Amino acid sequence: MKTKDFRDMTDEELLKEIDGFKTELFNLRFQLATGQLDNPARIREVRKGIARGKTILRERELKINRA
C-alpha cells in the first residue's frame, strides 16, 4: 500500500489498517516458523506498512503537513 493511500484515510481507518497488518504479520511469522511461508518478502512489506501507518498518525498528532 502506498503512502498516499494512507494519507487519504481517516485516523480510525488507519488504526484498523495497522491492526490488520499486525494480525497478518503474526500469521506470517507463524507460517515462517512452521515452514509454510510461500513469500518471505511479504513480511518486510507488512512491517513497512505498519511503519508507514504509524508515521502518518504521528505526523497528524504533531500537525506536520507533508506533500
Curated annotation (Swiss-Prot):
InterPro entries: Ribosomal_protein_uL29, Ribosomal_uL29, Ribosomal_uL29_sf. It holds the Pfam family Ribosomal_L29. It comes from the Bacteria. Keywords: Ribonucleoprotein, Ribosomal protein. This is Large ribosomal subunit protein uL29. Belongs to the universal ribosomal protein uL29 family. GO terms for molecular function: structural constituent of ribosome. One of its GO terms (biological process) is translation. The keyword RNA-binding does not apply. NCBIfam families: L29. The keyword Ribosomal protein applies. PANTHER family: 60S RIBOSOMAL PROTEIN L35/50S RIBOSOMAL PROTEIN L29, LARGE RIBOSOMAL SUBUNIT PROTEIN UL29C. One of its GO terms (cellular component) is cytosolic large ribosomal subunit.
